[in-house]
């Protein structure tokens, strides 16, 4: 699995960086969210507690998936802005923490 960052936008109003990337997975199934997030965080030197993987989209017959992640400046801002289901899906909070 290889990740190529296609665009990084600074969103000062929401206090985050918006990261668009391609995941190249030749001869492999689409990688898990956990694997992609781990590699992206390590590659860009981000904090895993304030980084949210919004989506990974795979297209039939393609060996490349497209993804979108958001890296927040603080955990408080992330918890205020992001929908609960995204935080649960990324493992940042659990369902019981509501």
Curated annotation (Swiss-Prot):
Keywords assigned by UniProt, alphabetized: Ribonucleoprotein, Ribosomal protein
One Gene Ontology biological process: translation
Family, similarity comment: Belongs to the eukaryotic ribosomal protein eS24 family.
GO molecular function, one term: structural constituent of ribosome
KW Ribosomal protein (keyword) present: yes
GO cellular component, one term: ribonucleoprotein complex
Protein name as catalogued: Small ribosomal subunit protein eS24
């Amino acid at each position: 699995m290889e990740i190529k960052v296609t665009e990084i936008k600074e969103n000062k109003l929401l206090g985050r960086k918006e990261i668009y990337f391609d995941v190249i997975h030749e001869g492999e199934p689409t990688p898990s969210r956990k694997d992609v997030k781990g590699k992206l965080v390590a590659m860009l030197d981000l904090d895993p507690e304030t980084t949210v993987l919004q989506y990974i989209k795979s297209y039939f017959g393609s060996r490349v998936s497209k993804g979108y992640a958001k890296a927040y400046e603080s955990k408080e801002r992330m918890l205020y802005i992001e929908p609960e289901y995204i935080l649960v899906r990324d493992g940042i909070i659990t369902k019981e923490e509501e």
